[in-house]
Amino acid sequence: MELDYLKGHMGNNVIIFLYGDQIPKGRELEAAVEVLQPHRVSGHETGILYPPVRDGDLMVKIVGFTSRAFITACGGLTQVLGKAAVETELGRRFRLPIREPETRIILETDAGPVPITAEVVGGEAKRVWTDMGPFVRECYELGLSRLELKGVPAIKVGKFLVLDGDKVKRHHPEADFESMPVRTQKILLSLQDEFKRQTFSHYHDFSLYDWHPQFTGDLRVLFPHNLATGHVEPACGTGFVATGIGLWELGDLHRQGLTDENGATVRYECGGAPVLVGPELASLDLTCDGGRVTGATFSHSLIEIIEEGRVVL
């Protein structure tokens, strides 16, 4: 099959879009997994786009590199989509309502409708905001729990393992998250395996953070989802949200002075390379009520369209 594609990234979280009307029925997953491979288009997630089936503007089916299966949410995908809708033929292809100074798109996902808002100036998307409310609900539905992984405190947020790098270093002082040598990777893989064992989980969703920002953020974050295969995302929208929920539940956002009467605002340093040093900034706004997170919106400082092309599978 011969497929058109659009490739972009959010802080080096690489997204590939395909068009559902070009894929033979029953081969959607096959096509989505294949284009992610390094010898093909190469990326972290694929979004297969379709016309809406409910009240949204378009629908997406998302496939992850490590899961090799359909997943419910991908924040990076929504950020790239917001930019692509404004700046490429994708917007016209789906007859999306592109307006200045603000374009709002409702994306139908398996987690629910996701509002995406692009700040538009001169035909360019200067900033994109994603409402991650459906993913917040999913996290609480799947459950939160505090864990101890071989002596290292951690928290489970939905599918995610959320881990404080400093707490890892208390037990493994040799760990170096700024260069991520093989020895450090083995430590993280061991902790992730223990997380899966304790939670009876097959998910690879993993957030590693610390409170040592080097630029203008509040903390640093990295997403080493599957170090065994090299699947490390310097930025991850669902990871930003899961980390924020975990830090709210642990009380760390309050202790760091990042909360107010409505919730919290967090700035993550991230992006660039697969290490815990990122020159870019992701902003997360949490809405909280009754002691728990009820909503989340986020935006990343660097979203780029890499290329449009055609691939033969």
Listing of model-derived features with the role each one plays in the protein:
Residues 1-124, 162-313:
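A glycine-rich beta-to-alpha transition motif near the start of alpha/beta enzyme domains, typified by
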Residues 123, 127-151:
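C-terminal binding/interaction regions
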